[in-house]
Amino acid sequence: MSATESLVAGRTRRANAGNKMRELLEKEHLRMTQQNAEIEKEDEEYNIEEEEEAERDIEISSESSDEEAELKKLEEEGEEVEKILRDEERIKKRKIQKNRAANLQRTLQPPKRPTPSAASEVPKKKYKKIKVDPSARRTSSRMHTVLMAQSTETRLQEAKPRRKYTVSASANRQKGTMTQQQRFEEAAKTEAQNLSSLRNYVHLEEQRRLRLKRNAAKHRQLREPILKFISKTISTEDGREASNYYVAPLEHPLCHSAPPLQMPQHRAVECVITGKPAIYLDPVTQLPISNVQAFQQVREVYNQRYSWSAMLNLFH
């Protein structure tokens, strides 16, 4: 049984707990009592019928002959057998009714809660002591085997006090159930520990990334020619700061090897009809045009109103 009590078993009992179940059990109890009353009524009617039948049998037996007496005996035997069977069925029904009534009485009674002393008792684990007998081991003359055996023996001897400490710590652990407030405090402590471990993990990850970046920059290979710029600040006596920059001289081969920069020349787009600078762009043919007449001619060519002359190299 667990030493920590569950939340359902530890909470206080509600005022309306079990009301519906109690109503159902009371209805079942009323139904069972009515059924028992009906069975007793049937028994009384059955006894009255038996008495009447016995009186009739006496009257008939006094008037009938011997043959009729034999027939009556056979009938009486059959009735006795039926009576025995009915009695057995009645006994079975009464047993079932008694069992149901006992179950209802048992369920109506409030359940007994286990005492905290019995719930807090936790079976203690039994530890078997391992005794090492050095005389029972096989010995070897090899140096490596002897050293390994000695190291194993020392580890076993060192593990004994640690094992005793763990056993005593588990024995001294507080017994009993935890309240809701204690569970909240334990959850808050666990959350704080998780946050601190997460911060440490993030810090270590950042340090690892910086270290990888520095190593990559340190071991990066550059192709010559290389021009290196170094800038730094120097504090002077009057408190001012100055920066020194290293600039490559004009005689440096890197300055002469670079080609001169050429600015791109902007060329005006001409109209395909007039040859003038184009202002518009036909959205269908995507051709530059300068005015409305050029636009109309481009659309007429597009609609195949003009035919192409391969000899003259134009539309006509």
Curated annotation (Swiss-Prot):
Question: What spans are recorded as compositionally biased (Polar residues)?
Answer: 167-180
Query: What subcellular compartments does it reside in?
Result: Nucleus
Q: Name one GO cellular component term.
A: nucleolus
Any one Pfam family match given in the protein's UniProt record, by short name: YL1_C
Question: Coiled coil among the record's keywords?
Answer: yes
List all Basic and acidic residues biased stretches: 20-31, 70-81
Which parts of this chain are annotated as the region Disordered? 1-81, 93-127, 153-180
Grouped into one coarse class, the protein's main location is nucleus
Q: Which residues form a coiled coil?
A: 20-95
- Which keywords are on file for this protein? Chromatin regulator, Coiled coil, Nucleus, Phosphoprotein
Subunit record text: Component of the SWR1 chromatin-remodeling complex.
The family classification in the record reads: Belongs to the VPS72/YL1 family.
- What functional role does this protein have? Participates in the catalytic exchange of histone H2A for the H2A variant pht1, an euchromatin-specific factor, leading to chromatin remodeling and changes in transcription of targeted genes.
| Name used for this protein in its record | SWR complex protein 2
Q: Give the organism's phylogenetic lineage.
A: Eukaryota, Fungi, Dikarya, Ascomycota, Taphrinomycotina
